[in-house]
């Protein structure tokens, strides 16, 4: 029998300049690109891989963190199986704005929200102004305590030094497959249409 092919959608989110495109570019091309112009719109690529012995197509979306993109972003938030939520570990504002990005994700999801938290630019040594590991752990714990997700998966990455880039996308792919299976299961057991509060099909 022909193996069923599964398309999983992963969306990269976070403030402008945190290094989203550099991560995305590194994952696609296996290298760091210096002097890249800022993103002017969303971009994506599709990669074929095996996740837990299942043949899947990973559709990874890069977005730009600018306000003008956020104003038009809802179509890109929808239909995701996992989000990679990025902040720069040396940029306080990008860490504080994680709450804003979470609010956006929550609008389009229900149940356990599949996301991976990514602290970027780990090749730059931490200073007093950087976000401490203790603060990041506290942020993860708050999210877990609110029941938004059972366990936050956190990676500190460097696109520049190739640290944790593949690892983060491997975990995102695994979470995306789990989410895909749950949504598929719900749509099978509720074929006539979901009750209003479940909103299958309009969420991630
Ligand atoms: N040291 C270091 N710098 C990085 C790393 N990743 C990205 N940068 C730098 O951070 C800046 C922003 O990187 P981008 O990948 O363009 O950031 P972005 O989040 O996609 O920005 P927008 O497209 O505006 O949303 C660039 O100058 C990169 O060279 C990293 O791992 N280490």
UniProtKB/Swiss-Prot annotation:
Q: Which controlled-vocabulary keywords does the entry list?
A: Cell membrane, GTP-binding, Lipoprotein, Membrane, Nucleotide-binding, Prenylation
The short motif Effector region is annotated over 36-44
Its localization reads: Cell membrane
UniProt-listed Pfam families:
Ras (PF00071)
Keyword Lipoprotein among UniProt keywords: yes
CDD domains to which the protein is assigned, alphabetical = Rab
Q: Where is the lipid attached (S-geranylgeranyl cysteine)?
A: 203-204
The molecular function terms of the Gene Ontology recorded here are: GTP binding; GTPase activity
Q: Which GO terms describe its cellular component?
A: late endosome; lysosome; phagocytic vesicle; plasma membrane
**GO biological process terms on file:** hypotonic response; phagosome-lysosome fusion
Keyword Cell membrane attached: yes
The protein's matches in InterPro entries, at most eight in alphabetical order, are given as: P-loop_NTPase, Small_GTP-bd, Small_GTPase
For the ligand (GTP), the binding residues are 14-21, 62-66, 120-123
Q: Which SMART domains match?
A: RAB, RAS, RHO
Please list which residues make up the signal peptide: none
SUPFAM superfamilies per the record? Answer: P-loop containing nucleoside triphosphate hydrolases
Broad class of the protein's primary localization: membrane
State the membrane topology: Lipid-anchor
Entry-linked NCBIfam families:
small_GTP
* Family indicated by similarity: Belongs to the small GTPase superfamily. Rab family.
Q: What is this protein called?
A: Ras-related protein RabL
